[in-house]
């Protein structure tokens, strides 16, 4: 692992556009390898997770950064992310023969569009926070803060995440109470289940029975009366920042920040039924310095060719020079696959 990480330091890769939109722009991204623990570079096990490589991503393009949600393709060849400025980011992923993440091969930026086919503008309209593939794999659901909403963006080519660029969205009907949430405390995480249920977690909503407010509702033909409220109890003092589903398992990413202790994160595992019943999630790993961590905001899970669970986590640098855009890869358990 150590040698693999060292050999990919500061990969500067020319990127090519993969999306259908004329506004999709190829960008250059620098990928610098980062150890799981800078104080112990040989460390690879964190709780129930095994480190499979990580990168710090930077670009000269001012619109690159602020990654707040992520989907990794089933074959792990591509990654689609959304940003706080309302952009799609599509990147090709590079791994070695052992599956260790080495870098990126391509990268492109394209504006997320409104229902009127115009690029989203300003924090109120463009603050994308969560993203999920629909259960049938034909569209991307994206959640926004500011003007709280969930938009459905059809894929130009089902199976090709990057083909969402240039898509004209439709707006899903919001559950009752969503618009009462603070501008910066709305939907922070979402995922779809195999049966077409959309699971939503807020950042600052409070459930009647305690915990962070969430909803379960149909992902299509959404009606406020069909939304089932539930409360999610993250470990104190964390708040949920993203959800990812793999088969019947839900992975919940959570974050905490304080001036005194800095930033930290928790990854937990649960199911839709457990969420509905108010059962506590199972903690898999805790990201606390000196472990590599930043403003953890996006998680995606895929099944490898050999059947292992691979988990990808991205951080949101808020377009701040003192924060980082991290892309970290893990496998569940202690397998080297």
Task: Describe the residue ranges of each PLM region.
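Sequence/structural signature of beta-propeller domains
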Residues: 16-337
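Positively charged n-region of N-terminal signal peptides that target proteins for export
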Residues: 1-4
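Bacterial N-terminal signal peptides
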Residues: 6-14
